[in-house]
Amino acid sequence: MTSTLNTLKSNLGSRKKKLRKGRGIAAGQGASCGFGMRGQKSRSGRPTRPGFEGGQMPLYRRVPKLKHFEIINQKNYSIVNLSKLSEFKDNEIVNIDSLVKKKLLFKPKFPLKILGNGVVKVKLKVQAHAFTKVAQEKIESAGGSCEVLNNK
């Protein structure tokens, strides 16, 4: 059997009629249209917005905002750039105590970390708890040494 445009039919159940609410009891959706009896949810202009609690102060406004929280296990360092280490002489040891004596570090309460901003022209023995890769490369290329201290 050949099919032509005038004999085409849609599949059964593929073209379902729209349910007409409020058009008589026999339809099954008459009178209250499936919204139940009285109340805000049965009125026109529904639904209420998400999070609405009937005029009561909603939960998302009762709970305080998430702010001023501390990062768990955050590693804080007292930082010194290589540009400040130019005040030291050749073959001098650089550690927290020597930095405090030269007033390059004030009241250090965190472990020492050396950052790579600046140039080192002298040979230094640097003792710190952490180094950036660039800082370590610059110190060693100048003929110095980097000693990583135990981080307690």
Curated annotation (Swiss-Prot):
Keywords: Ribonucleoprotein, Ribosomal protein, RNA-binding, rRNA-binding. It comes from the Bacteria. Belongs to the universal ribosomal protein uL15 family. InterPro entries: Ribosomal_uL15, Ribosomal_uL15/eL18, Ribosomal_uL15/eL18_sf, Ribosomal_uL15_bac-type, Ribosomal_uL15_CS. The keyword Ribosomal protein applies. SUPFAM superfamilies: Ribosomal proteins L15p and L18e (SSF52080). PROSITE patterns: RIBOSOMAL_L15. Part of the 50S ribosomal subunit. GO terms for cellular component: cytosolic large ribosomal subunit. The keyword Ribonucleoprotein applies. Residues 14-23 have a biased composition (Basic residues). This is Large ribosomal subunit protein uL15.
